[in-house]
From Swiss-Prot:
Residues binding Zn(2+), per UniProt: 295, 385, 389, 394
Originating organism: Saimiriine herpesvirus 2 (strain 11)
Single biological process term from Gene Ontology: regulation of DNA-templated transcription
Location of the protein in the cell: Host cytoplasm; Host nucleus
Top-level lineage group: Viruses
Protein name: mRNA export factor ICP27 homolog
Region of interest called Disordered, as start-end residue ranges on this chain: 1-143
Gene: EJRF1
Region (Interaction with RNA): 64-120
Keyword Transcription regulation recorded: yes
UniProt biased composition (Acidic residues): 1-28
GO cellular component terms attached to this protein's record: host cell cytoplasm; host cell nucleus
UniProtKB keywords: Activator, Early protein, Host cytoplasm, Host nucleus, Metal-binding, RNA-binding, Transcription, Transcription regulation, Zinc, Zinc-finger
Function statement: Probably acts as a viral splicing factor that regulates viral RNA splicing. Functions as a multifunctional regulator of the expression of viral lytic genes. Early protein that promotes the accumulation and nuclear export of viral intronless RNA transcripts by interacting with mRNAs and cellular export proteins.
Length: 417
């Protein structure tokens, strides 16, 4: 006991000193708490608890130990291999022969997303000499290699003998026509030969009387392919005067179809109507070559209609699109009216049941036709042009296209009023 009293709790002074020290600490902390209360927000709705000294000392931020591993960020722009360029759909990647990136080996194992776009290390793909199908030519046509052949030698003719004619398939055999009308038989006999066009005139009053006897030849003839081949041969090598005569015949025959309630269809065989599409394409080519069309368009500015209709028919034979385009404007030019007359019959033949609006528009054009209108339109236009145009080149070109004589082989009649 004595040792204990001597070592620690021997006297009362120690207790007094410890009490005094604790009182000093309490006296030091109490005014600090009051100061913190004073510096708080004005409405102390909930008093804050007194700060704990031991908690504040335990929440000190520790210093992070540095890791021995060094982290480095590598940008995708500084990688050693070359990423494959994005390819268009359906296009092969092209590898240049003088590429410098082939020396470095590429490891594609770590690149999972780019594994599908690997470049072949073999020979480069052969570049086509023609322009790509998708898109127009931007930088002009590609240059051919200097050692490319001009043409294949195997396509040259084997024999060097001069040829004075070309082989043409012969016409089928002709049979006797099944009709008893002498006037119609005489008309068919004249149609087989190239006779003057004045001998084939037929008045508009006589045609309805001879319609049914003539229908037995035009529609029910046993020589259908003979007549169609003869008419197409004449139309293919015809001048503008011959084309106008055939067009007058076709339009007047179509009017008789309309008056007798006949149906225009592709399945029916008709000598006159089945050559209307060839007649239309030939007329379009003649109009495109005529220089006097530009002179006629100065009074009635519908040159764009002529160009558009000629483009639709001459490029892809888009007859129905040409009729749709003609529906959008009023015809104010004789050349546009001539094209409308020529396109109405082929469009009426190929119109289906779903295109009733186009069919009715073609019938409206056909009803407005008068016998001999095509010849009269061209005659007035040419007369007006020759009296005003001083160009000699234009006059010579017009003479070559119009022609001086009409070929009437295959023509049955020329309608007149």
């Amino acid at each position: 006991m004595e040792d204990i009293i001597e070592g620690g709790i021997s006297s009362d002074d120690d207790f007094d000193s410890s009490d005094s020290s604790s009182d000093e600490e309490e006296s030091d902390t109490s005014p600090q708490i009051m100061k913190s209360d004073v510096t708080m927000a004005s409405p102390p709705s909930t008093p804050e608890p007194s700060p704990d000294v031991s908690a504040s000392t335990s929440n000190l931020k520790r210093e992070r130990q540095r890791s021995p591993i060094t982290w480095e960020h590598q940008s995708p722009l500084s990688r050693v291999y070359r990423s494959p360029s994005p390819m268009r759909f359906g296009k092969r990647p092209r590898i240049s022969s003088n590429s410098t990136s082939r020396s470095c080996k590429t490891s594609w194992a770590d690149r999972v997303r780019e594994a599908a776009a690997q470049r072949r290390p073999s020979r480069p793909f052969r570049k086509p000499y023609s322009h790509p199908r998708n898109g127009p030519l931007r930088n002009g046509p590609p240059r051919a290699p200097p050692l490319l052949k001009l043409f294949d030698i195997s396509i040259l003719p084997k024999s060097g003998e001069p040829k004075l004619f070309l082989p043409v398939p012969s016409l089928p055999c002709q049979e006797a026509e099944k009709t008893n009308d002498k006037y119609v038989l005489a008309m068919a006999q004249r149609a087989m030969h190239d006779v003057p066009i004045s001998s084939k005139q037929l008045t508009a009053n006589l045609l309805p009387v001879k319609f049914k006897p003539l229908l037995s030849i035009v529609r029910y003839t046993p020589n259908y392919y003979y007549w169609v081949s003869m008419r197409k041969e004449t139309i293919a090598s015809a001048n503008l005067c011959t084309v106008a005569a055939f067009l007058d015949e076709s339009l007047c025959w179509g009017q008789q179809y309309l008056k007798n309630d006949f149906i225009f269809s592709e399945n029916g065989k008709d000598i006159i109507l089945d050559t209307s599409s060839a007649l239309l394409s030939q007329l379009v080519h003649k109009i495109k070559m005529l220089p006097f069309c530009h002179c006629l368009m100065q009074t009635t500015p519908q040159d764009h209609i002529v160009k558009q209709v000629c483009y639709l028919i001459a490029s892809n034979n888009r007859i129905l699109d040409a009729v749709r385009y003609l529906q959008t404007s009023v015809i104010k030019s004789p050349i546009v009216l001539l094209l409308a007359y020529a396109v109405c019959l082929p469009a009426a033949i190929i119109c289906t049941k779903n295109e009733t609006q186009l069919y009715s528009h073609c019938m409206r054009i056909l009803k407005e036709y008068r016998p001999g209108d095509v010849m009269n339109i061209l005659h007035e236009s040419l007369t007006q042009h020759l009296n005003k145009c001083p160009s000699s080149t234009c006059a010579y070109t017009t003479r070559a296209i119009v022609g001086t004589k009409a070929n009437t082989t295959g023509l049955f009649f020329l309608p007149t009023q």
